[in-house]
């Protein structure tokens, strides 16, 4: 250990200790003594470095360097100089673990940003700027994972990165490539600049294996593709990994991307599934430790750093969705939050923090030896002595004794957390079990046995298992009281399996006898509701607290408005989450009211339609504001500037939505119209034409409504009823809509217009649409031509959608599509409007079938007896269709049970539309 030539190091004692601690420090001193002496003169290596200091140092060293090899040499020498400084500080107790790991992480950030900037210019010169489909220059989003993300890097850590970009597109140069390929090349160069080993060493080892699909997948991924991956393929261990994710470079698009990952990591409900994932990861690590014989690894071995992190992270994943303070990336910060929240005892927090800091100091001492990424205690006496000098222990045995004490405390707490004591229900419940087995068939009995022996149950924490055992007899008792116990049991078991990790729901069901009974009754009537609750357990919150009154329109509007007020306009994922939960929870309320309170059909349809309309109106408002924020307001057709009150945009509901007849699984038939000056530009800094503005509002609306996520989507949307169908523009101006309907539309499109109704958007534009609708529908038409066209369309639907001849022979009747079904009545109502409203304009006023029939009777076009008979038939068939939807059954029913109703409908069909249909039922 030669130090004679180090005349500028005033504190030779500190220098000697540094060199005793680290062979690597000796090597750096031999190679870069002049640099180190200059650095020492500044502050004697005593002061901490701020993030600004570090970024400025990197910038100053690399300033004006154009040559790649020179850039790589300079940054590697800077890294060696700083490593010497940090080893000096650590060996001489001039820093602490938190400060040291923060500075190391800041240096990594600075190097990544510098490498990213240096790598970009040659690519742009060759391929041009990467431009997204929205016309914006695309940036490479660099996400730091693991210790880098948490700003907890150790002395010789690798850095875990993920590369992303906002959206697809192409570069604008002569040698154009797509944005993804550009970002891949960009990322590859960034890695090379930092990771490649030269004569001067490396800067950071770069690990990209945490990206979606890991090794072998594309190096850079779009925001949308990442979101889709997490929703469809994200695994539990990836939730642990993404806790520490941090945007190192990428601006607002990076922030948006990170915000998108939050619901994947932190579930809204208390989520005990995190235990299972932790056990699996721990088992995998234990197998690896045994295979590689690395029990002395202070990170992966029993009681090591990883177990402390697991303890903290499992609580973060379980409770982080409801306790935002637990979402912090840093282990020690989150550990203290766990203590403050009462999730860990204060003494446990103190012991874990003490052990963690000790283990991290040992880790630094090991890595300082030779700048190697290892956490294994050395075997060589010389290296052991260096560690003893750093940590200030007299003998190796003394050190090991202290280390084992810390590891034992961590290990005991970890074991306490993941103990797996699972048994069958207590023998005191044997009598109930016997009663249950007496009424269950063999399949159901096997299901009970498999449930209590399942791996999923064995992975539950003991507290959750105990709650499940407490819940079980209450569940059996409720099943035994059911009129259909076998059916109720089979339908509810998937729900029990779904929520058994979220034991708060089990407790709530136990505490509310009425809720348990309602759940069992509902299960016998509606497997659809059971499946919704099973797939989206968060809806249980609503079910357990609902009063089974149908929701009122004003209450729906107030509720959704209040929820959305708390969300910023650019927090798209949160907006979609609120919209999805609003729709699903309120539809569930309606279904429960339908099943348990036997609410009238018309009121049920009104409520379902209200939920859809409120959702559409709120979504349109969000979409409009988002486009305005980016591009400014458009001008309307008269040249006036639009506003949030005068939007110039409206949504038209067709089909069941327009007819106020929505069912439980109905999609929404929508048409978008606008009143913009299509050529005039918006008044924002990124202006677009009025036509482009209208298109983007509609596209944003559809994205918010139809994007598939873990919570499903808000609604399925069908826009094919717009002018010219799928070949037509997504959004139509009111004037173009008018011209199309008056000059180009087929009669079936006017049929569809009968059930059209403006449901959201600017009031003035909506009124103009309603006036136009009435104008079109009340045109004078040849009654025979209308009859022929209606008949042709109806026959086409029967041929494609109705029951086959073979099915009819077996007594099958399709409630909706066969003769005498719902569509026959709808077509008759539409025929009345198209054929008779020229002379009777009031027929065109309403869009729902019942009121059209009432108006036809009022106008004398239909006898009151016939109108009443049709309404009764229609309501009976629709009520049955609702019941079948809730029961997850098809619309094919026993024809014999519907013969009288069908005869009523078919006789009127024969009289109004098709005299040749007299044998419709007889032929079956």
Curated annotation (Swiss-Prot):
Involved in the regulation of glutamine synthetase GlnA, a key enzyme in the process to assimilate ammonia. When cellular nitrogen levels are high, the C-terminal adenylyl transferase (AT) inactivates GlnA by covalent transfer of an adenylyl group from ATP to specific tyrosine residue of GlnA, thus reducing its activity. Conversely, when nitrogen levels are low, the N-terminal adenylyl removase (AR) activates GlnA by removing the adenylyl group by phosphorolysis, increasing its activity. Its EC number is 2.7.7.89, 2.7.7.42. Coiled coil: none annotated. It comes from the Bacteria. Residues 1-422 are annotated as: Adenylyl removase. Belongs to the GlnE family. This is Bifunctional glutamine synthetase adenylyltransferase/adenylyl-removing enzyme. It comes from Acinetobacter baylyi (strain ATCC 33305 / BD413 / ADP1). InterPro entries: GlnE, GlnE_rpt_dom, NT_sf, PII_UdlTrfase/GS_AdlTrfase. GO terms for molecular function: [glutamate-ammonia-ligase] adenylyltransferase activity; [glutamine synthetase]-adenylyl-L-tyrosine phosphorylase activity; ATP binding; magnesium ion binding. Residues 424-924 are annotated as: Adenylyl transferase. It catalyses: [glutamine synthetase]-O(4)-(5'-adenylyl)-L-tyrosine + phosphate = [glutamine synthetase]-L-tyrosine + ADP; [glutamine synthetase]-L-tyrosine + ATP = [glutamine synthetase]-O(4)-(5'-adenylyl)-L-tyrosine + diphosphate. It is an enzyme of class 2 (transferase). The keyword Transferase applies. GO terms for cellular component: cytosol. GO terms for biological process: regulation of glutamine family amino acid metabolic process.
């Amino acid at each position: 250990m030669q130090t004679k030539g180090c005349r500028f190091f005033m504190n030779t004692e500190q220098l000697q200790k540094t060199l005793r601690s680290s062979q690597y420090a000796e090597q750096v001193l031999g190679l870069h003594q002049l640099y180190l002496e200059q650095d020492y003169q500044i502050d004697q290596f005593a002061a901490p470095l701020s993030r600004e200091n570090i970024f400025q140092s990197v910038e100053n060293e690399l300033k004006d360097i154009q040559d790649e090899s020179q850039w790589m040499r300079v940054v590697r020498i800077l890294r060696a100089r700083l490593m010497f400084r940090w080893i000096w500080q650590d060996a001489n107790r001039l820093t602490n673990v938190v400060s040291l790991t923060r500075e190391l992480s800041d240096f990594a950030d600075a190097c990544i940003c510098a490498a990213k900037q240096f790598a970009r210019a040659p690519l742009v010169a060759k391929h041009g700027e990467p431009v997204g489909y929205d016309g914006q220059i695309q940036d490479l989003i660099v996400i730091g994972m693991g210790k880098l993300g948490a700003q907890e890097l150790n002395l010789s850590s690798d850095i875990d990165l993920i590369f992303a970009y906002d959206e697809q597109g192409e570069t604008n140069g002569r040698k154009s490539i797509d944005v993804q390929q550009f970002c891949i090349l960009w990322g590859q160069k960034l890695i090379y600049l930092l990771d490649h080993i030269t004569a001067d060493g490396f800067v950071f080892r770069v690990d990209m294996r945490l990206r979606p699909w890991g090794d072998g997948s594309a190096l850079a991924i779009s925001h949308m593709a990442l979101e889709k991956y997490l929703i469809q393929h994200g695994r539990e261990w990836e939730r642990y990994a993404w806790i520490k994710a941090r945007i190192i470079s990428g601006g607002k698009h990076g922030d948006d991307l990170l915000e998108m990952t939050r619901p994947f990591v932190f579930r809204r409900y208390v989520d005990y599934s995190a235990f299972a994932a932790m056990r699996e990861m721990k088992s995998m690590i234990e197998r690896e430790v045994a295979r590689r014989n690395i029990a002395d690894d202070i990170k992966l071995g029993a009681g090591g750093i990883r177990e402390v992190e697991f303890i903290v992270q499992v609580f973060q994943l379980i409770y982080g969705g409801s306790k935002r303070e637990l979402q912090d990336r840093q282990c020690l910060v989150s550990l203290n939050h766990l203590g403050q929240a009462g999730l860990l005892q204060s003494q446990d927090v103190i012991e874990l923090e003490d052990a963690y800091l000790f283990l991290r100091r040992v880790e630094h001492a090991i890595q300082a030896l030779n700048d190697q990424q290892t956490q294994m205690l050395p075997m060589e006496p010389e290296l052991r002595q260096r560690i003893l000098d750093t940590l200030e222990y007299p003998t190796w045995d003394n050190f090991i004794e202290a280390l084992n004490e810390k590891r034992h405390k961590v290990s005991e707490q970890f074991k306490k957390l993941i103990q797996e004591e699972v048994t069958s229900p207590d023998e005191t419940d044997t009598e109930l079990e016997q009663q249950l087995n007496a009424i269950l068939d063999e399949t159901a009995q096997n299901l009970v046995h498999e449930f209590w022996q399942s791996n999923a149950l064995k992975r539950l924490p003991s507290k959750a298992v105990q709650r499940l055992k407490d819940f079980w007899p209450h569940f059996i008792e409720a099943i035994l009281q059911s009129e259909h116990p076998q059916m109720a049991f089979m339908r509810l078991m998937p729900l029990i399996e779904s929520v058994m990790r979220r034991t708060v729901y089990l407790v709530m069901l136990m505490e509310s006898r009425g809720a348990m009974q309602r759940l069992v009754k509902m299960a016998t009537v509606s497997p659809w509701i059971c499946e919704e609750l099973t797939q989206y357990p968060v809806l249980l919150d609503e079910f357990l607290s609902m009063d089974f009154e149908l929701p009122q329109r004003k209450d729906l509007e107030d509720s959704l408005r209040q929820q959305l007020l708390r969300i910023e306009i650019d927090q798209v994922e949160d907006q979609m989450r609120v919209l999805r939960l609003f729709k699903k929870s309120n539809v569930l309320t309606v279904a429960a009211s339908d099943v348990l309170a036997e609410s009238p059909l018309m009121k049920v349809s009104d409520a379902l339609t209200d939920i859809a309309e409120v959702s559409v109106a709120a979504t349109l408002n969000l979409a409009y504001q988002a486009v305005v924020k980016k591009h400014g307001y458009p001008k309307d057709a008269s040249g006036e500037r639009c506003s949030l009150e005068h939007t110039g945009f409206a949504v038209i509901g067709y089909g069941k939505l327009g007819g106020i007849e929505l069912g439980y699984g109905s999609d929404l038939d929508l048409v978008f119209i606008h009143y913009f000056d299509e050529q005039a530009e918006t008044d924002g800094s990124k202006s677009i034409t009025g036509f482009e503005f209208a298109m983007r509002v509609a596209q944003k609306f559809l994205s918010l409504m139809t994007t598939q996520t873990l919570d499903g989507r808000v609604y399925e949307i069908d826009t094919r009823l717009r002018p010219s169908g799928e070949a037509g523009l997504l959004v139509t101006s009111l004037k173009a809509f008018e011209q199309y309907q008056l000059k180009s539309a087929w009669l079936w499109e006017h049929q569809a217009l009968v059930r059209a109704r403006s449901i959201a958007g600017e009031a003035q534009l909506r009124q103009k649409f309603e006036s136009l609708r009435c104008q079109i529908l009340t045109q004078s038409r040849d009654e025979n031509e209308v009859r022929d066209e209606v008949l042709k369309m109806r026959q086409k639907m029967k041929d494609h959608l109705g029951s086959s001849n073979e099915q009819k022979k077996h007594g099958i009747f399709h409630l909706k599509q066969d003769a005498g079904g719902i569509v026959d009545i709808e077509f008759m109502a539409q025929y009345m409007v198209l054929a008779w409203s020229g002379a009777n304009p009031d027929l065109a006023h309403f869009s729902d079938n019942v009121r059209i029939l009432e108006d036809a009777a009022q106008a004398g076009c239909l006898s009151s007896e016939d109108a009443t008979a049709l309404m009764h038939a229609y309501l009976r068939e629709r009520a049955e269709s609702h019941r079948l939807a809730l029961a997850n059954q098809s619309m094919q029913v026993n024809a014999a049970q519907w013969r009288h109703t069908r005869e009523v409908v078919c006789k009127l069909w024969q009289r109004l539309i098709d005299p040749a249909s007299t044998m419709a039922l007889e032929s079956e």
